[in-house]
Amino acid sequence: GLADTADALGPHSREKSLEVMRDSRIGTFGAVALWAVLTLKVAALSALSPHAFWPVLLAAHVLARWSSLPLARWLPYAQEAKGLGAGLASLIDVRGLVAATALMLLCLLGLVGLRRGLWLLGGALAVLLLTGLFYRRRFGGVTGDCLGATNQLIEALTLLIATHPHF
């Protein structure tokens, strides 16, 4: 998802960008994006204190995976040929999204507490909003690759926020 979305960011038309996402090969932008996000995650994880490592890692994972639900619910599916993201989008109704959000909040607060949870949630919501607006403008909606890219970006940002000395 992250690599395909990054590869689609080149100077392409919307149609060409979506075609690039369907291509199974990885390009330069995709390789650089994978390297950058993986390096950021490793650096952030190595900077976490031992007592915060597991709660923060789990909180990052919960937030990142939850982010697929509002994106898939609120944005149209961008590709003609239906992929995995289209199946997810068709399953999410408002009640399901509210229930998943409540469960995510319970997990987040149970793992890192209220103050830290609000910081992590704020970062995740900022990434969710910015990527959602970008996907709508650039691709006309969301794809499964976009959902995966947002997952990885939110996970990396969550880990980075948790390394702040006042976290």
Language model regions located:
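Hydrophobic alpha-helical transmembrane segments
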Residues: L9, S13-K16, D23-F167
